[in-house]
Amino acid sequence: MGAQLRVYTQKIKSAQTTKKITRAMELISASRIQKAQQRMAASAPYSRAVTRAVSAVATFSNVDHILTTEPEKVERAAIVIFASDRGLAGAFSSSVLKESEQLAELLRSQGKEIVYYLVGRKAVGYFKFRKRDSERIWTGSTEKPEFETAKSIGDALVEKFVTPASEGGVDEIHIVFNRFVSIATQKPEVVRLLPLEVVEGVEAPVEGAVLPLYEFEPEVGDVLDALLPVYIESRIFNAMLQSAASEHAARQKAMKSASDNADKLVTTYTRLRNNARQTEITQQISEIVGGADALASSK
């Protein structure tokens, strides 16, 4: 019986130690969420300005550009998956990987060949475990995204997109990431990045008003050549920031759940230990009383 008490005591200590770790990780994630939200808010004006500029050029000009023109036939499509570098974040990575699998199934049903670009070690591990190939990978920056990484991804995607499919290029590009809705809610989202669909930033004209006339210097094609890569990079960076904030929120939620479960384990094992101690004391009393009765009857 004493051994059983020691087992319960050890389990209580183990649960308490685990709770200290998960509680610390919960607090760290909470502070990182605030920083991630601040970065999202700080990048929003730049993203809106770039979107308005691209919208103006694409809407008020009649120039066909490779990044905005729909191909006659889509043979190959790229999927960029934004997962995490670390675990202990609940269903954060699994949800975005599941969404990407559903997207891939849809694209394959349309007769398209899939090329994967992976961001985050969890996505890389997922593909390695299933022995599936990927075009390129980026790791080490999911928790604190850097614009240099977004630029690297954007450059690789644009280069792949302008290359003909017959030479290893792609006809369209999709990104899959977790959008940060709130601390309690993060939703996996799919966005078609290329060919460009500029639907933001174009204000509806007032009835009877004359549409603005734009003059572009240099030529419209040159303006698009300069603006569109910047637009792609800003969209990718925004996806990385959304994903980072979602990751911290998911980890905070997972660690809070782990801390609550540790509390429940401590309560359960404490009750079991008390019951075991009570049983041991009762048994000892019974043995003493039995021994006393035996001595009394022998006299």
From Swiss-Prot:
Its main location: membrane. GO terms for molecular function: ATP binding; proton-transporting ATP synthase activity, rotational mechanism. One of its GO terms (cellular component) is proton-transporting ATP synthase complex. Transmembrane segments: none annotated. Keywords: ATP synthesis, Cell membrane, CF(1), Hydrogen ion transport, Ion transport, Membrane, Transport. It comes from the Bacteria. InterPro entries: ATP_synth_F1_ATPase_gsu, ATP_synth_F1_gsu. It is a peripheral membrane protein. GO terms for biological process: proton motive force-driven plasma membrane ATP synthesis. The keyword Acyltransferase does not apply. The keyword Transport applies. It holds the Pfam family ATP-synt. It is found in: Cell membrane. Produces ATP from ADP in the presence of a proton gradient across the membrane. The gamma chain is believed to be important in regulating ATPase activity and the flow of protons through the CF(0) complex. Belongs to the ATPase gamma chain family. HAMAP family: ATP_synth_gamma_bact (MF_00815). F-type ATPases have 2 components, CF(1) - the catalytic core - and CF(0) - the membrane proton channel. CF(1) has five subunits: alpha(3), beta(3), gamma(1), delta(1), epsilon(1). CF(0) has three main subunits: a, b and c. PANTHER family: ATP SYNTHASE GAMMA CHAIN, ATP SYNTHASE SUBUNIT GAMMA, MITOCHONDRIAL. This is ATP synthase gamma chain. It comes from Clavibacter sepedonicus (Clavibacter michiganensis subsp. sepedonicus).
